[in-house]
């Protein structure tokens, strides 16, 4: 379509990530005409990035533990998952010819671990079903006359739609289109948006120059992280992390990012204690390290007697001064409880995902904006977060399905004169 202003017969879906594609599929399955608009030259770019190291589609963790991974929004996301949970997602992928398996960690992957075949099959099926794709259409908000306003290579254009699903992503991948540029447009129309923050992100610590230069990129595993929540309750989680030039990142840190962010906001910094020797208790470490060292260096002694070397040994040197490094009891205690003070989260554009977004209380159960009848929101632009491990993708799919079905139902009711008379033109 090249007209400066055009009118769609049904639903406009804005955003070609998993949430938008699923919304388009759900609405089209309900018989609605669907036009999907994508800012980039092709859809699913972040989805493809997620598949670079092996596409983690979902997780095999059973309910209610699975839903609990969504933290403060567990109840709301659980409702979406009842319609489209991890097993339904695997069945859906199978319908596209992509079988999956459960890895040793409980994560679910396609058999070939690739994202591209699934995405190609999905887009092909959507096109066969009649979904119309419009790439290089970057949404700018609404025109003065209520039309959806897009920037295209041919210039700006307006599109009037009876209903719209917004699946615009969070703010953590600006190079792929998820830049949070939609926030002001939605706030101007009465939707409350929780500020976007980095989630599944690294944190700054402030290493010495020596440590940063020698050990950036080094794995720190296995470890057990200990921390306290806002009530003073202690928690522990085993996993692995990676030293960076400025601090730490990795799956263990990502799993704690919400709690760490909250602590930094509350106290100015967050404390994390790492057990660097989870296979040995303190008394055993004291005995092992108390053996005669002879002429061996401290590094060699730690390696031989406690299996501690590389970045773990360097962390001990970061934490203790020269006097303490001569005391094997102090070293043993530090190995079991190495203190790390986290100063700040890394910037949003470095994060895997974002927290914050459209506050769910401003939407109805069908994810329609209460202030904008006919406008639905889905995916990472909503105010929820989850750790890596397949939980992010699953909720994006599930919220897209919920929004697409709800939009189709709203359009049917409106056509029958049963619903509100307002449209998605605002």
Each language-model region and where it sits:
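Beta1/beta-strand and adjacent pyrophosphate-binding region of the FAD-binding site
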Residues: 4-19, 35
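Glycine-rich FAD pyrophosphate-binding loop
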Residues: 12, 28-52
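Short hydrophobic core segments
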Residues: 12-14, 37, 139, 158-174, ...
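Residue-level recognition of phosphate/Mg2+-coordinating polar/acidic sites
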Residues: 29-30, 40-42, 63-65, 82, ...
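A conserved short coil-to-beta-strand element within the FAD-binding core of flavoproteins
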Residues: 135-147
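Glycine-rich loop(s) and the adjacent beta-strand/alpha-helix scaffold that form part
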Residues: 163-209
């Amino acid at each position: 379509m090249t007209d400066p202003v055009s009118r769609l017969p049904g639903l406009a879906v804005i955003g070609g990530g998993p949430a938008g594609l699923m919304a388009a599929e759900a609405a089209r399955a309900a018989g609605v005409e669907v036009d999907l608009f994508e800012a980039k030259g092709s859809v699913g770019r972040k989805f493809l990035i997620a598949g670079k190291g092996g596409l983690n589609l979902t997780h095999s963790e059973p309910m209610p533990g699975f839903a609990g991974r969504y933290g403060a929004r567990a109840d709301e996301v659980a409702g979406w998952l009842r319609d489209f949970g991890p097993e339904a997602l695997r069945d859906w992928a199978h319908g596209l010819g992509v079988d999956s398996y459960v890895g040793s960690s409980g994560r679910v992957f396609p058999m070939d671990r690739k994202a591209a075949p699934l995405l190609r099959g999905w887009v092909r099926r959507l096109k066969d079903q009649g979904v119309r794709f419009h790439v290089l259409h970057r949404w700018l908000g609404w025109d003065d006359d209520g039309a959806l306003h897009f920037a295209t290579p041919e210039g700006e254009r307006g599109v009037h739609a009876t209903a719209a699903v917004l699946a615009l992503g969070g703010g953590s991948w600006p190079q792929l289109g998820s830049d949070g540029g939609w926030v002001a447009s939605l706030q101007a129309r009465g939707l409350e948006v929780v500020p976007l923050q980095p989630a599944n992100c690294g944190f700054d610590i402030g290493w010495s120059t020596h440590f940063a230069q020698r050990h950036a990129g080094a794995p720190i595993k296995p470890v057990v992280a200990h921390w306290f929540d806002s009530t003073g309750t202690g928690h522990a989680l085993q996993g692995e992390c990676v030293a960076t030039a400025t601090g730490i990142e990795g799956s263990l840190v990502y799993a704690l990012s919400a709690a760490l962010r909250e602590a930094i906001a509350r106290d100015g910094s967050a404390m994390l204690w790492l057990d660097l020797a989870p296979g040995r208790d303190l008394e055993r470490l004291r005995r092992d390290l108390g053996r005669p060292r002879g002429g061996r260096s401290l590094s060699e002694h730690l390696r031989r007697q406690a299996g501690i070397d590389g970045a773990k040994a360097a962390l001990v040197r970061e934490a203790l001064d020269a006097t303490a490094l001569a005391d094997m009891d102090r070293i043993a205690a530090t190995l079991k409880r190495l203190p790390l003070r986290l100063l700040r989260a890394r910037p949003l554009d470095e994060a895997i995902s974002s927290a914050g977004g459209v506050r769910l209380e401003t939407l109805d159960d069908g994810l329609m904006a209460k202030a904008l009848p006919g406008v639905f929101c889905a995916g990472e632009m909503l105010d929820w977060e989850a750790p890596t491990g397949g939980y992010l993708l699953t909720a994006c799919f599930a919220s897209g399905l919920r929004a697409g079905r709800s939009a189709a139902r709203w359009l049917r009711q409106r056509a029958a004169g049963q619903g509100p008379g307002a449209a998605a033109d605002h």
